[in-house]
Design a protein with these regions (language model features):
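A conserved ligand/cofactor-binding region detector
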Residues: 1-526
């Protein structure tokens, strides 16, 4: 959607078109290419696809698939255009693993003028009417909050840059800051669009688990269409792929059914227990390698062939993390996985327990190498509202009142749908982006360093920025030697005197973060 298309009046007519799946680009003869790659393993030269016979496709293809030699199917890549898919499906399934690439329409920058939302297969006219009423209320509240918050956004901008905002074009640009906060009330059913690229092997995997809870009905449609598009391009590509695991045989479904016979899940008690473990944090460091820095130093010495007498731990760590010594750190391109010395950052390891909004985790999960165990939401449904309130909402009394009243209202809609017999996986589509999620996330220091660098920038949305600051502070308290130079791009680049300090151009936040001694919540204006 262009900026011009996203700036008109809000339309309260609900549009719920079917998912649109288009295969945009793909390898020519992808299955033949996979077999040629397999043959190359046993050849002194590279085998061309033109040399592949029908017998080889059946014999080698079957042998590779049945024998678990699946990397040959990873060479073939498919790029899809996906439209009219729900954000719940994207979060729950499409982006729940690390092996993909997406460029997705952003609710932070694209105003949602039209009510475009997924409608699950809800039975009964009255139930469907109630569902659509809930969706409509989401958009009405979104529009209301956008208008209320715009004044705050403009005021803060004027204070930061010490000048009045009078230009309509600039006001329109600033309105995006208002909608990125207001989007917390939009439903999980809200449509999104994207370019989504994945390998043939990943498509095989998604096909296998297509019935996984909780968005299985939408998965069958979207993944089914993706598979049909590939089959049309190359009928051979799914020659040996087995049927998906039935819903009743999936481990999550079987576990839930067996648990019901013992003691039903109690989401309220679970949430209370989890939150008590967090204490004052929203992202709490719960586990780490005590000797992480020492392991990193050992790895540096092993890489460079040095003894401990030649290089102590502090100097070894500093050789990697000091931007004045490591030019790679001053670049926006992350090369830590291909730099021999920077691979030493892989050895320290950290685990966090986190409570965050669905909106925030949809950003958080895009850091695919910081892996997390995320909730199957249907097992954690609560009758009482359970949501995150953005900082910008809390400081505006009018917005806060509208926000809290809406949360009570939307949970009532969801509860009424459940009372009417609507399955929980369908009813939860009306829940807002603000719904609280609780998860366990872990990663090595290298991947966290990259994530923290991006999300500690003040251009990052406030919620994920605050979680990032909490994580960095806790690791700094335990291991100061690992955090001596950490921060957003501007903080890292100034330590090497690389200009410009800020890499965001005209998106600069307006605050000289590189001059701050530390990142503090109260220092951030927006």
């Amino acid at each position: 959607m262009s900026e011009e298309e996203s700036s008109g009046p809000l339309n309260y007519e609900i549009a719920s078109p079917a998912p649109k799946v288009e295969l945009l680009r793909y390898f020519e003869k992808p299955f033949d290419f996979s077999i040629s790659a397999a043959r190359t393993c046993y050849s002194p030269r590279v085998i061309n696809t033109a040399e592949i016979t029908e017998d080889q496709k059946k014999r080698i293809g079957g042998g590779c698939f049945e024998g678990g030699h699946h990397t040959v199917f990873q060479h073939a890549t498919f790029s899809f255009g996906l439209e009219n898919i729900s954000r719940q499906f994207v979060w729950s399934f499409l982006h729940s693993h690390p092996f993909y690439n997406s460029e997705q329409s952003s609710q932070r920058y694209v105003r949602l003028n039209e009510i475009k939302a997924t409608t699950p297969p809800i039975e009964g006219a009255e139930n469907l009417k109630l569902y659509k009423k809930a969706i409509t209320r989401s958009w009405e509240t979104y529009n209301q909050l956008s208008e209320i918050l715009l004044g705050d956004v403009i005021k803060i901008h004027e204070e930061i840059f010490n000048r009045k905002v009078t230009d309509d074009k600039e006001k329109k640009k600033l309105s995006k800051k208002a909608i990125e906060i207001a989007r917390y009330v939009t439903p999980l059913a809200a449509h999104t669009s994207m370019v989504h690229t994945l390998s043939g092997l990943t498509l095989y995997r998604l096909h296998k688990v297509i019935n996984t809870l909780p968005t299985q009905w939408e998965q069958r449609i979207v993944i089914g269409e993706m598979i049909n598009a590939v089959k049309k391009a190359d009928p051979d590509f799914f020659m040996f792929v087995q049927d998906p695991v039935p819903l009743e045989e999936t481990p999550e479904y079987k576990f839930f059914q067996s648990q019901l016979q013992k003691t039903p899940p109690n989401p309220d008690k679970f949430n209370q227990e989890f939150d008590s473990q967090l204490g004052k944090y929203r992202s709490k460091l719960v586990s780490y390698l005590e000797d992480g820095p020492a392991l990193m130093a050992d790895a540096v010495r092993a890489t460079m062939g040095l003894t401990k007498g030649q290089m102590n731990d502090d100097d070894a760590i500093d050789s990697v993390l000091n931007p004045a010594k490591n030019i790679y750190l001053t670049e926006t391109l992350n090369v830590s996985s291909v730099s021999p010395l920077m691979r030493a950052m892989n050895h320290p390891y950290f685990v966090f327990k986190k409570k965050l909004s669905h909106a925030c985790d949809s950003q958080n999960q895009r850091h695919r190498m910081t892996t997390a165990s995320r909730p199957v939401m249907i097992f954690l449904d609560t009758k009482t509202p359970d949501y995150i309130t953005p900082y910008q909402i809390t400081r505006n009394k009018e917005a806060h009142k509208v926000y809290d009243n809406y949360m009570k209202e939307i949970w009532e809609y969801k509860n009424e749908l459940l009372e009417r017999g609507v399955p929980v996986e369908h009813a939860q589509y009306v829940l807002p982006n603000a719904v609280a999620l609780r998860l366990v996330e872990s990663s090595n220091y290298s991947n966290l360093y990259h994530k923290w660098r991006l999300r500690s920038c003040l251009d990052a949305q406030r919620e994920i920025w605050e979680l990032t600051v909490e994580e960095m502070d806790q690791v700094r308290e335990k291991f100061p030697q690992l955090m001596k130079y950490n921060g957003p791009d501007c903080v890292v680049r100034i330590k090497a005197d690389v200009r410009p300090f800020c890499t965001q151009g005209n998106l600069w936040c307006g605050q000289p973060v590189w001059a701050w001694k530390e990142l503090k919540f109260e220092k951030r204006a927006n």
